[in-house]
Amino acid sequence: MIQYVMNQTLQNSVIAQTVISDIKAGRPVIIVDSYDRENEGDIMLAAEMATTETLAFMAKHARGIMCIPCLAERLDRLAIPMMQSNKLDKFVTPFANSIDAAQDVSTGVSVSDRLNAIQKFVSESSVPSDFAQPGHLFPLRARSGLLQERQGHTESSVELCLLAEMKPIAIIIEVMNDDGSMARLPQLEELANKFKLNMISIDEIREYKYGKDSI
């Protein structure tokens, strides 16, 4: 039993390191809630590595809403408030006001328009007036304790950016099936195999960052 646990921990570490290498190289990865449940998954990319080609791939093959998870400090600095919510679930997705770039934008819907907004959001020189609200890119505020506080795709994507020694700003899109239903583990594995995307669970990220006792 001890040997099995050690082997599993080593395997999880290799998975995490492979995913981190992909993120550093600007390759998208898949984050899944859990391997032991047929849960949902997101395609994720470090925001500072976004290109029109990668965003177009994510939009085409994930099909969900394009979101930009970040820490609260980024939203505060850019004066982007949280959306008002009447949901009582403490784990509700933490949406801030949607944004577009204020300049050099057409409708805000195109990949190039959203890349423009992403690049301004990532830039350390950007100011609140660089953005129009509402828009077509959806910021998400990660909890300050990240995966130690909330085990969501928002926090896990920011954790992966930090592990890759990049800015704690990600791009995530939920994966949907052709018929509009949410993709579950079998469909996520099929997508990963088809496009050679590495996949990692939230628990694996948490274990790699904080140790097995954190799970």
What are these model-predicted stretches?
Residues 2-215:
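Catalytic domains of riboflavin
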